[in-house]
Regions:
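Positively charged, low-complexity terminal tracts
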Residues: 1-60
Length: 60
């Protein structure tokens, strides 16, 4: 399996909100360790937040 494979997943906005909350919680409780993993989590948090904002904008 290629570790650099990209995948597409369909999720509801509720799923995205839950995943965003989970990532935020994990970052708040970060025990230290792999800095690269922490960077990925920050990137994921930003991406998920942009999805939530886009959904809110489109609902106007």
């Amino acid at each position: 399996m290629n570790p650099n494979s990209d995948y597409t997943v369909e999720m509801s906005v509720d799923d995205i909100r839950l995943l965003y909350k989970s990532v935020c919680f994990h970052l708040e409780k970060w025990p230290g360790g792999d800095a690269v993993e922490q960077e990925y989590l920050h990137h994921m948090k930003g991406s998920l937040y942009r999805m939530i904002l886009e959904h809110k904008f489109n609902e106007l």
